[in-house]
Amino acid sequence: MVTRDVVAQGTFDILHPGHVHYLREAKAMGDRLHVIVARSENVTHKAPPVVPDRQRVEMVEALDPVDYARLGHAEDIFVPIEQIEPDVIALGYDQHHEVEGIETALDERGLDCEVRRAGPRKASEDEILSTGSIIEKILDERS
């Protein structure tokens, strides 16, 4: 029996239902889900995480869809992908990475891997599906 390994990645600063949705969709793309949690110093496209690196890994690892969680490499985001050798890389619907750019980088490294994008989760009326929005709400309500 062939096992399909899937990689998901992200910051996962303050966990919310959007993260769970992404990880469930990623898990459905294969048999084993490996999650690479971005190191704080590598998060440059948005505000740095509030929650420490190891704590974010521990929280992600505790989620049902996740089989393995690890901290990303300090200098090269593709090192863990080379170690895992996944069949699929699952991108979140709102992640800033472009599928074509990831595919090109994988080809350059000799990695044969499908790149797919998970779909969005529609928020219910009272749901907050963004870490930034959660932080803003906390600041508004606790000030």
UniProtKB/Swiss-Prot annotation:
Keywords: ATP-binding, FAD, Flavoprotein, FMN, Nucleotide-binding, Nucleotidyltransferase, Transferase. It is an enzyme of class 2 (transferase). Belongs to the archaeal FAD synthase family. Its EC number is 2.7.7.2. It catalyses: FMN + ATP + H(+) = FAD + diphosphate. InterPro entries: Archaeal_FAD_synthase (IPR050385), Cyt_trans-like (IPR004821), FAD_synth_RibL (IPR024902), Rossmann-like_a/b/a_fold (IPR014729). Pathway: Cofactor biosynthesis; FAD biosynthesis; FAD from FMN: step 1/1. Homodimer. This is FAD synthase. SUPFAM superfamilies: Nucleotidylyl transferase (SSF52374). ATP binds at residues 11-12, 16-19, 94. Catalyzes the transfer of the AMP portion of ATP to flavin mononucleotide (FMN) to produce flavin adenine dinucleotide (FAD) coenzyme. GO terms for biological process: FAD biosynthetic process; FMN metabolic process. NCBIfam families: cyt_tran_rel. Disulfide bonds: none annotated. GO terms for molecular function: ATP binding; FMN adenylyltransferase activity. The keyword tRNA processing does not apply. PANTHER family: FAD SYNTHASE. Its cofactor is a divalent metal cation.
